């Protein structure tokens, strides 16, 4: 597969061609979770689905920290790729492998033995705990596969290859789609079968990916050895704030749910439906953010500030154009999209109302993803953490509470939409006037 050298060539063409496989990969990740829920809900019932959902929340919280380390991977390796420092790339990849293996063992063991305690801390209904504990313990047994599966994709994207990871993700989705009903119903393993199907699919995809990249020499892997202290320190320096960003987002959404929950079942159901749509609507923006991170990282690595500016400018134009088209589609077809998930009239009415309020604010969240991706490429992870704190806790939650208190349930969409607008303004101000351009991850020898 082709790996892009983002330090030369047509920026817009590279942005589109590189981000499309990332968007498809993210869509497949969403479908992985959707298909899993579909089989569990239909074959095992609502209680099993609830148990799996609670367990998945815990696993995703742990994964969010690891995704932070993956963002550090993307930034560090993109800059090394830009400098064409193969030895440096190999050394940092080794450090990531050692850290991820250690964290996998630590998180896996702790999660396995603390599963019941974690579920009780989340106030899981007593009737669900046995099912949830079974599902969660199996997930923690296979957490190395989950980490590794995401890690290989991130490394390849950092090196300019977004197509090869799509192969592994698609393989895992197809495998899970086949294995889940087989393990649940044919082998009569129940919810344990669903969990084993997930980790087996991810495990085989991880091993397939590892074999593929080694065979085709796509990544400079080596026999693992103890990394240098400065390498581990840099990874953690960037990775911990990036991991906390994900937790800030999760916590912010939980706070917003407290506002939504106060309006009754029909609003909660309608909001749940629009959140499912939201995970699809924002796929292009997320893909653009990941793409510009890799593209800008390579150019920051060689000090090409002018091209970084071009990437930012064209990235913003492209994402606004794309999200405006999506906004029009949401405005016109929102009611029908909501009905894919729910049929209760009051819930559908709220969902349609929400989408009409928020539709034309979506381009601003695209701007946010792109500009944060640019500054993240320079290693400004702590600064992006602060921007996310502003976005979710200074803007989104207060605006949602304020506008809903003023306008009732229709104020929820307006409040969240206004937070998109002001968050993008904050991101632009830091991009324009912040000191991220002066950051240096590596000292010249």
From Swiss-Prot:
It is a multi-pass membrane protein. GO terms for biological process: monoatomic ion transport. It is found in: Cell membrane. Keywords: Antiport, Cell membrane, Ion transport, Membrane, Transmembrane, Transmembrane helix, Transport. It comes from the Bacteria. The keyword Coiled coil does not apply. This is Probable multidrug resistance protein YpnP. The keyword Transport applies. GO terms for molecular function: antiporter activity; xenobiotic transmembrane transporter activity. Belongs to the multi antimicrobial extrusion (MATE) (TC 2.A.66.1) family. The chain crosses the membrane at residues 15-35, 49-69, 95-115, 136-156, 168-188, 194-214, 240-260, 277-297, 314-334, 355-375, 384-404, 411-431. GO terms for cellular component: plasma membrane. InterPro entries: MATE_fam (IPR002528), MdtK-like (IPR048279), Membrane_Transporter-Flippase (IPR052031).
């Amino acid at each position: 597969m082709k790996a892009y050298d983002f330090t030369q060539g047509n920026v817009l063409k590279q942005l589109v061609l590189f981000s499309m496989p990332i968007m498809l990969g993210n869509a497949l990740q969403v479908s992985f979770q959707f298909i899993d829920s579909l089989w569990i809900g239909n074959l095992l019932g609502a209680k099993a689905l609830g148990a799996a959902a609670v367990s998945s929340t815990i696993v995703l919280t742990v994964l969010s920290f690891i995704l932070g380390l993956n963002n550090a991977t993307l930034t560090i390796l993109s800059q090394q790729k830009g400098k064409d420092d193969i030895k440096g790339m190999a050394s940092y990849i080794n450090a990531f492998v050692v850290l991820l293996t250690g964290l996998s063992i630590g998180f896996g063991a702790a999660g396995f033995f603390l599963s019941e305690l974690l579920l009780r801390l989340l106030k899981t209904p007593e009737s669900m705990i046995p099912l949830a504990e079974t599902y969660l313990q199996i997930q923690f047994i296979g957490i190395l596969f989950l980490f590794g599966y995401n890690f290989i994709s991130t490394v390849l994207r950092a090196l300019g290859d977004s197509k090869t990871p799509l192969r592994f993700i698609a393989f895992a989705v197809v495998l899970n789609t086949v294995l889940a009903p087989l393990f649940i119903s044919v082998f009569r393993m129940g919810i344990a079968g669903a969990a084993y199907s997930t980790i087996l699919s991810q495990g085989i995809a991880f091993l397939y990916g590892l074999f593929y990249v080694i065979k085709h020499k796509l990544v400079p892997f080596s026999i693992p050895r103890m990394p240098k202290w400065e390498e581990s320190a840099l990874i953690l320096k960037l990775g911990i704030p990036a991991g906390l960003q994900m937790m800030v987002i999760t916590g912010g959404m939980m706070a917003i749910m407290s506002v939504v929950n106060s309006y009754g079942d029909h609003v909660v159901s309608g909001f749940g439906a629009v959140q499912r749509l939201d995970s699809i609507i924002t796929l292009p923006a997320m893909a653009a953010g990941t793409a510009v991170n890799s593209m800008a990282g390579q150019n920051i690595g060689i000090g090409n500030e002018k091209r970084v500016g071009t990437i930012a400018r064209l990235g913003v134009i492209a994402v606004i154009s794309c999200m405006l088209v999506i906004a029009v589609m949401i405005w016109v077809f929102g009611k029908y999209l909501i009905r894919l998930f729910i049929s209760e009239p009051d819930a559908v009415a709220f969902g349609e109302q929400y989408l009409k309020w928020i539709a034309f604010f979506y381009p601003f969240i695209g701007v946010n993803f792109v500009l944060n991706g640019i500054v993240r490429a320079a290693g400004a992870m702590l600064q992006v953490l602060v921007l996310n704190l502003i976005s979710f806790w200074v803007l989104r939650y207060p605006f949602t509470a304020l506008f809903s208190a003023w306008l009732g349930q229709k104020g929820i969409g307006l409040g969240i939409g206004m937070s998109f607008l002001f968050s993008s303004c904050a991101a632009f101000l830091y991009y324009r006037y912040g000191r991220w351009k002066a950051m240096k991850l590596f000292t010249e020898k």
